[in-house]
Amino acid sequence: MGLALGIQEFGRLEKRKAGEGHANVHFSSATDEWETPQRLFDELSWIFGGFTLDPCATRANAKCIRFFTKADDGLAQRWEGKVFVNPPYGRDIPLWVRKAYEESLKGALVVCLLPARTDTRWWWDYARRGQVWFLRGRLKFGKARNSAPFPSAIVIFGRYFSV
């Protein structure tokens, strides 16, 4: 089994059931935080040999021992090592994707979970410069009952192995 197949298999497990609705928050601007599904994080951590930093965390959902919260301002910090990024999906997402790309140029390996918004400027300016793995189906973020109303992708910036 190839590593990319493992990602696709995860996507199959998270497929949305026909007729399921979405929580109202998914269609509102009530939040731009989408908590990473633990199983997806665990699989990515295994593929990349563990992550050393989560720069877009809350104390409650941090995925790494070293993490930055909103108060720490992850955009203003240096990212080193193997970094996992699931940024807020609001208006600042272009800043996070640019930061991920720029930190990879300084030596970090940055693995991002992003909405697959291929029609956006930030996707064309930065996301497409990484290796892109589109996830099959739609993810269930955090404790949501239903799948997200958008597809997702893993974007990898930096020196890494090819799968």
Task: State where each predicted segment sits.
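Class I S-adenosyl-L-methionine-dependent methyltransferase catalytic core
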Residues: 2-163
